Structures are given as C-alpha cells and as structure tokens.
C-alpha cells in the first residue's frame, strides 16, 4: 500500500489502521511518525550521525526565551508539525522572539512545543532529493522567491535540476535508513561551513516540480518499487 496523503495526521492514522489490518504500507508507521515531527526527526538523524542543523526545544514561554539566549540569534522557529513553510519564522533578536512566542502561547497546544534551529548560512536555495528504495532517483535546487529567505515552492520559489553526486546520494540514503523510510523526499542545505546537511525528511513527498524540471517519471518509479515489493 503506497501512502500518498500529504496530511500528517490523516496519513499517520490511516497508516496505523492499514497496518492494523495486516497491510504493508510505504512508508511504515514508525517512519511516518518520525518524519512528520521535526523534533523527532532531528533527534533520530543526529543519533544516526546525519549532518543536520543544530536545534533546541523548549516547553514553556520562559524556557523558550532562556533557550534562545543560550542558543543565540538569529534562530529559526518551526512548528514541530507543519509543511509548505507555514508558521516558520526567522527570529533576529530578543524582542521579535518574545512577540512570536507570546502569540503562540494563545494558539493550539501543539504550538507550545518550541522548536528552534540555527540559521544556516547558505546559498539562496536548498535541495529536494527523491529517494526510492536505495536510490536517489532525482534532485532539484529550490531557489527562494523574491524577498523570501524560505525556499518552499509553495511560497513562489523556482526549481532547477540538481546533479546527484555521490556525496548527495550517500547522505540521503543514510537519512532515509535512519528514519526507516522506503520512499521519501530529503531536503538539504549547502552550509557555507559544514557542507550538505539534512533539514527535513518528507514521508509523503511531493514531486510535481521535480518531474517538471528533471523529466524523471517519479510516480512511475514509486509504483514500480511498490509492485516489486508486493511480488517479493
């Protein structure tokens, strides 16, 4: 069974139900759970030795501000569950951070889990690589839109072909195995200081722009992989 719901909560619960009925789901529940939560994903990637941005988590307004003082500015605040660049903010100094955190104290409890990442100095782009099984089948550069520091295509970014180097393939496969995935999208940054680092692994990765730019039949490769597993 190939899980394709882009909703974290729907895909998580549907996968649990399908596995409970005896189905093999791509990706399995453990992978869906780990990749859909940025804090969980960070912990498992770091434990596996995958280069990933430094991060810190806090669970109250005061501890969040204290964590940022130690962590340093600028910092990036992200919801632990979310997509398409929504609710992600760049905190450049203390007053801005306090305003954002005070607002989140009045939101849904999920937003009371404060997850911060270092602001990585990088070119104005990131990389989306599609992993199917043990292969990186395609990759694109995602460039920031006008006036944006985020590279999400949903925010007006543009895409170009990214060559799949051995370094890129190695880190993507390592990240995929760390989370227990089979078909994933790995998002990476090219740190000026540390080179390639993984900042997200996507459980039900989107691929429209990857297909458009690279010409690779990503959905066909996904289906072929699932059918081959079923025959095996």
Language-model region placement:
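Phosphate-binding site of ATP-dependent enzymes
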Residues: 89-179
